[in-house]
Amino acid sequence: MTSSSVLPSTAAQIVQSFLDAFARHDVEAAVAAADPQVTVTVHPLGLHATGPEILKTVLTDLVRAFPDLMISVSRVIATGDVVTALFKAEGTQAASYAGAINQEKHLDIDQAWRFTVSSGLITDVSAYWCQAQLYRRLAVKRYDEIAIA
């Protein structure tokens, strides 16, 4: 290893490298920061599962539905091995997402993701955002008629 190829070592650096990869739409690089037994919880979607394939699906669905997705990180707060990232996700819908059919609406939504890092890998990801706000931004008129995609 050369001095110019420094790997992230602190929990905050590991999470920042995940977020940087996600912002570049490099899902493979983002998922590479996760432990093989990573626990993934996406509270607004009612998702709670284990494994990097789940994380890959969550990220891929976002990038697919919003191909111009921009992730603007406002804060990364580290407390030991737990890191919270606050960011805004922005983009124009180009495919169905979370049951909302594509109406080419612009989405901008604040999110908070909590990560736990152990032995240099992300072992837990919990994502939070206001699902009602997401549906309003995507022009869903009736929540009882969400299309399951």
Please report, for each region that a protein language model flagged, where it lies by residue.
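C-terminal and inter-domain tail/linker signature
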Residues: 1-149
